[in-house]
């Protein structure tokens, strides 16, 4: 019987996905399709929770199938992150004119980053005090507890290393491994490696302009391809949101969702 209900739930999910595809063919705006996927996911998830319960075998098997869409979408997003970071940084640096611009840009980026972080922290503090928010009110599920345990292990690893050792981890000793996210500092290492490539192109530009021009054309072509891939992945957002929200609402207690909604509301106010 559980298998039958699982099949029914999967068929319903396919129908909802078909509805979103129909909306796309009717040229409904992207924003409306995303919010439609969000609303359908919430409704379908609550129906599953009401009909079977959060811990039922039917919900577990159904959400496993839903993950083909939801987790698949997240995986595709992760796929484009590193290539997008690399080509964006390389393209930005190699198109600068002179080292002074590079220094000014670096200083401006750091200044803007520090200012925005300070503003965000201040707004968060004021909002949390205004709403009297306490994260302890939200009970963590098995997934959250497992993630918290992993985070504690990572924090422990950081504490065991001195500051010089932590700084040395930023050096991309194996940039190809860092592109796979092999280390905790892989993303920053990729950024540094990409910056080195951009600066190297500026150096070659003075001595061998023809080779630099050839490399620029190649990077511009790769950049265009990566942006196209990003566009294709983002078009899947309504379907990914539908599957992810359905799984979340079907496997999370309503009381905890309501508590979390308070935090979400406060976040929008902030």
Segments (PLM) and residue ranges:
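A generic, lipid-embedded transmembrane alpha helix
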Residues: 37-55, 116-122
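Acidic, negatively charged sequence tracts
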Residues: 143-150
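Short, hydrophobic transmembrane alpha-helix segments
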Residues: 1, 18-28, 51-54
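Loop-to-helix transition at the N-terminal end of transmembrane alpha-helices
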Residues: 28-46, 68, 74
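Signature of multi-pass transmembrane helix bundles
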Residues: 2-7, 21-25, 35, 74-81, ...
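Hydrophobic alpha-helical membrane-interaction elements
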Residues: 58-77, 177
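Membrane-water interface of transmembrane alpha-helices in multipass transporters/channels
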Residues: 58-65, 103, 254-262
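Hydrophobic core of alpha-helical transmembrane segments in multi-pass integral membrane proteins
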Residues: 9-21, 42-44
């Amino acid at each position: 019987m559980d298998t039958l209900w699982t099949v029914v739930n999967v068929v319903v999910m396919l129908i909802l996905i078909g509805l979103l595809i129909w909306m796309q063919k009717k040229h409904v705006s992207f924003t409306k399709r995303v919010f439609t996927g969000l609303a359908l996911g919430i409704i379908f998830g609550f129906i599953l929770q009401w009909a079977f319960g959060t811990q039922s075998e039917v919900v577990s098997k159904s959400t496993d199938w839903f993950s083909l869409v939801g987790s698949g979408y997240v995986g595709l997003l992760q796929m484009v992150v590193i290539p997008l970071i690399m080509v964006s940084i390389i393209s930005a640096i190699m198109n600068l004119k002179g080292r002074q611009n590079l220094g000014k840009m670096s200083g401006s980026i750091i200044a803007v980053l520090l200012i925005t972080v300070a503003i965000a922290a201040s707004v968060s503090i004021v909002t949390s005090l205004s709403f009297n928010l306490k994260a302890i009110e939200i009970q963590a599920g098995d997934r959250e507890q497992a993630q918290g345990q992993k985070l504690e292990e990572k924090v422990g690893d950081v504490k065991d290393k001195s500051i010089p050792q932590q700084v040395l981890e930023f050096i991309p000793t194996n940039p190809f491994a860092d592109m796979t996210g092999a280390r905790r500092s892989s993303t920053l290492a990729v950024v540094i490696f990409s910056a080195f490539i951009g600066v190297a192109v500026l150096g070659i530009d003075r001595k061998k302009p023809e080779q630099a021009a050839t490399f620029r054309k190649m990077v511009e072509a790769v950049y265009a391809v990566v942006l196209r891939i990003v566009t294709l992945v983002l078009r899947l957002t309504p379907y990914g949101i539908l599957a992810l929200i359905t799984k979340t609402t079907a496997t999370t207690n309503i009381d905890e969702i309501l508590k979390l909604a308070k935090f979400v509301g406060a976040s929008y106010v902030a």
